[in-house]
A protein has these predicted regions:
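Mature, well-folded catalytic/scaffold domains that follow N-terminal targeting or propeptide regions
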Residues: 2-332
């Protein structure tokens, strides 16, 4: 009689395990990929290549989100992530962050979000924290609990994600005026996300994005342009002509737009996904290579005092330092 040996269960294996939602709840919470198609959303008609890019991004986001409802292990997430292209990996992770936070609203389960943050928060800090914000848009009663789980430095990006969600899914209502009661930097971060949303609803057209921002309150425009800059660089599609057109159309807010570009560039370098497409535009705008810009952005982040990180002002201070760096470059 052959001896039977049981597989060894290690602490690492146990930590890797996740519990899928019941099938009936999965069915209720799952999102149809068609929801991000332009014809369904009613977005402005765009060039075919732009439309295909933005729809592909939305579908990658939903693949990440939907997987979290049924996933059984982080190994399964890693396998799915490996199937995504360099362009789409970050958006898959962003969707997964939304899904993780949403799954945690179901009672009597071991929280998924803290483990998701630990797994992907270092490589994709901006995408993970912004993705969580989309959940807050849907489950405002969970806002306090979710924010408490986030990195205190990047926590503001949850409001960015909330602004993006509202602009993307409720553009007419969001364009009509603020759809929140946020104060202080939370309101600014919200508008940075709304600016990202404007890039999508404008069909990746710098001109249409500029026209949209021009209809909004003047005090909101710096942050809206910052969001456009981030989306232009991270999502695209955009070449050097679009980068320089955005600088021109942003006018007095060009430094804000460039700040968004710098953050997107640093994020792409960090997750090793920067494509040839935006390289020339980044260099034309900033006057340095993408690698040098990403290094500078990281140096500025590390220069923020620990006291500012602890009291929640670090993220705003970081963005301000990036903006000043662009202003100095432009005047040199």
């Amino acid at each position: 009689m052959k001896n039977r040996t049981n597989p060894i269960t290690t602490n690492e294996n146990i930590a890797d395990q996740l519990k899928p939602l019941p099938a009936i709840i999965q069915k209720f919470l799952a999102l149809d990929p068609k929801r991000v198609e332009f014809r369904v959303r009613g977005f402005d008609l765009a060039e075919k290549s732009h439309e295909e890019r933005l729809e592909a991004i939305g579908k990658a986001f939903l693949r990440g989100y939907n997987l979290m409802l049924a996933v059984r292990s982080f190994a399964e997430i890693d396998q799915a992530l490996a199937q995504e292209s360099d362009l789409l990996r970050g958006f898959f992770i962003e969707g997964g962050a939304m899904g993780s936070a949403l799954v945690d609203s179901v009672p009597f389960r071991k929280p998924m979000l803290p483990r998701y943050l630990a797994r992907f928060g270092t490589q994709f800090p901006i995408l993970v924290h912004a993705g969580v914000g989309l959940t807050i848009s849907k489950l405002s009663w969970r806002e306090k609990g979710i924010l408490a789980e986030l990195d205190p430095f990047y926590r503001w990006l949850a409001y960015d994600g909330r602004g993006y969600h509202n602009m993307y899914f409720e553009p007419e209502r969001t364009l009509a005026g603020p759809t929140h009661k946020l104060r202080g930097y939370a309101a600014r971060a919200y508008d940075q996300g709304a600016g990202r949303g404007i890039w999508f609803i404008s069909g990746a057209s710098v001109e249409k994005a500029a026209d949209t921002i021009a209809t909004m309150a003047s005090e909101r425009r710096p942050d809206l342009w910052a969001g456009v800059g981030l989306a232009l660089c991270y999502a695209g599609p955009a070449d050097s002509r679009e980068f320089m057109a955005a600088k021109k159309l942003a006018g007095d807010h060009a430094a804000d737009m460039a700040t968004g570009v710098a953050l997107a560039c640093a994020a792409r370098i960090k997750d090793q996904s920067l494509s040839p497409e935006p390289r020339e535009g980044i260099t034309a705008l900033w006057g340095v290579t993408p690698e040098a810009l990403a290094e500078r952005v990281e140096e500025l982040r590390q220069s923020i005092p620990l006291s500012a990180v602890a009291d929640g002002t670090g993220y705003a201070a970081w963005r301000k330092e990036i903006l000043h760096a662009f202003t100095q470059n432009s005047s040199a």
